[in-house]
Amino acid sequence: MPRKGPAPKRPIDIDPVYGSQLVSQLVSKVLQDGKKQVAQRIVYTALEGCREKTGTDPVVTLKRALDNVKPAIEVKSRRVGGATYQVPIEVKGTRGTTLALRWLVGYAQDRREKTMHERLMNEILDASNGLGAAVKKREDTHKMAESNKAFAHYRW
């Protein structure tokens, strides 16, 4: 444990094109091997595709998708005696957004479309409509927490 306490939170940059922190975080999640321009092109193309398909602001569509994917509760492993319990705990603030973005990008990569921007666009559109693998992951997480509710008193 560090003696100086937890590291301070760094401010999140605002995206230059959409003026949104969420888009900036999404670019960071798509980023691989430090190729930020490639990640930006993927995200911007996906968001423009969302605009064409829905006819609405893509940032609003992204926020709606994240609200549908963001978990309210998750499970953490806690070792008590010789047994390991899955203890349900509520997800606080930025962790929910981080998990939602991670799941959105992760399940977009697993899709069958040819290019990454198509996959990301379709996953965002599915999530904004309450469909898709990322929304299913959230439901599974909530089910897991519900089934382990008996261990909630082991919370720390």
UniProtKB/Swiss-Prot annotation:
Keywords: Ribonucleoprotein, Ribosomal protein, RNA-binding, rRNA-binding, tRNA-binding. GO terms for biological process: translation. It comes from the Bacteria. The gene is rpsG. Belongs to the universal ribosomal protein uS7 family. Part of the 30S ribosomal subunit. Contacts proteins S9 and S11. GO terms for molecular function: rRNA binding; structural constituent of ribosome; tRNA binding. This is Small ribosomal subunit protein uS7. GO terms for cellular component: small ribosomal subunit. CDD domains: uS7_Bacteria. InterPro entries: Ribosomal_uS7, Ribosomal_uS7_bac/org-type, Ribosomal_uS7_CS, Ribosomal_uS7_dom, Ribosomal_uS7_dom_sf. One of the primary rRNA binding proteins, it binds directly to 16S rRNA where it nucleates assembly of the head domain of the 30S subunit. Is located at the subunit interface close to the decoding center, probably blocks exit of the E-site tRNA.
